[in-house]
Amino acid sequence: MKISKTVKRILDNYESDSPGTKANLARILMNGKLGGTGKIVILPVDQGFEHGPARSFAANNAAYDPHYHFQLAIDAGLNAYAAPLGMIEAGAGTFAGAIPTILKVNSANSLATNKDQAVTGSVMDALRLGCSAIGFTIYPGADEQFGMMEEIRELAEEAKSVGLAVVMWSYPRGGKLDKAGETALDICAYACHMAALLGAHIIKVKPPTDVLWQPEAKAVYEKQKVDISTQAKRIQHVVQAAFIGRRIVVFSGGEAKDTEGLYKEVRALRDGGANGSIIGRNTFQRPREEALALLDSIIKIYQGKE
């Protein structure tokens, strides 16, 4: 595998990591249509666990099939495919080596009342399935946040020791946070920084709004005149929180939205210096050809062609 100069520069930021871990990061960064550019688009399909099968897949019945998602990610030229244990097991043989995979090792479900996730996969599962990385969600702000942080600390240490990369979903929720707080700029930047501090190689956060939720933080933003006037500027600030861009930061697509709204958001991500997108429901809930066209346009935006 030839590694581009851009990707080599990114890998240089991970100064403590082994050649094995860097090789797995390189596999993700060099794969697909964006390979070598430093930008990535990943398909995540953990929504069946999070929201249930009907809410996730009834809009496109083909999406009940785990093979559908592997093939969609491959045909779209994406960098990687992320999913829980059973989804990856169901296609691991057929698609072995076809696309880098990320095993989501913890999961929540919509039947629970507390903001927490169960550990549902292991580092050994990821190795057995040929994955390049493990994925783990933390909920900064939740009553269970410290337990989640301790879990990922142990899992990350084990993953790195065997050459796997660590992808962290950092989603503020629970505790004192209201809905506005979950996507407030100061909170999103804080969540991104926590993931970096916990040792994530790739950090996934939600696109921030212009809300400043913590009064103490709001006072600092105003005193220091931090520019939060546009979405691109807010994205830039979140990336800054990940060690001034020394860690890969990607943003979620969230609930399904109209095409133009999605493209506008992706342009802001690109202009703000994001490394890319992890986008699920906005793609696999559409008919296959429509999803492929949408993903191609997103890739072209990151390439600067649209």
Identify the meaning behind each predicted range.
Residues 1-2, 35, 40-42, 47-81, ...:
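Alpha/beta enzyme core
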